Amino acid sequence: MREFLIIATLGALATTNASATSSWLDSHDVQQQLAAGQVVVRGAMDGRAMAARVDAAVKVHADRDAIWGVLKDCDHAPSFIPGLKRCQRVASAPDGSWEVIAHDVKYSWFMPTIHSVFRADYQRPSRIDFHRIGGDLKDEQGSWLLEPLPDGSGTIVEYQMQINPGFWIPQAIVHRSLRKELPEALAALRIRVESLQAARR
């Protein structure tokens, strides 16, 4: 059974650009973990600002187009993404270069459902950037990056997010999200993509 490996770094929240953030994936240890099928996560929290940054990655045995289709499948996303109760397209560009999407997410049984509205900008098939434009959270922004492996064995899917809910959240909830919920979401994405690809063969 594939294991989840969590790399959690608690300290000051650092804001870096995407290329600098992705350099963490070049680590030999991280590369070994990805090759072994692990979901790798690292996070940083700023308790004073109630903000957090998270980077995560997983290897998917599929090409970028297959992964892209699942990432954009709003209609079916709640059926395989843990905690996501609703995904709705609110608006979209005529040329398909961006969409406005609304999410309702239940992070924990004793917390209210969080409503989030964000704009997603698409650079097919390699990148999706998103940022908050409405909803309950004070700030939310991040990216999905799809990098094909040189040997053609699959794609590294990297997820980056900076979030500031604007209200206090118990650190136990944040730790649980890093330790359990985010790896489950990326594993669910991998399972969905690989199962759809297998069904087409």
Label each region the model flagged:
Residues 51-59, 98-100, 115, 127, ...:
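Intrinsic-disorder/low-complexity, polar/charged segments enriched in Ser/Thr/Lys/Arg/Asp/Glu/Gln
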Residues 53-58, 64-66, 106, 132, ...:
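Second-shell loop/turn segments in exported
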Residues 4-13:
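Sec-dependent N-terminal signal peptides
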Residues 162-201:
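A conserved amphipathic terminal alpha-helix motif
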Residues 20-93, 184, 188-191:
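Hydrophobic ligand-binding cavity/cleft-lining segments
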Residues 21-24, 28-35, 107-154, 162, ...:
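Hydrophobic-ligand binding "helix-grip"
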Residues 15-17:
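N-terminal signal peptide c-region/cleavage motif recognized by signal peptidases
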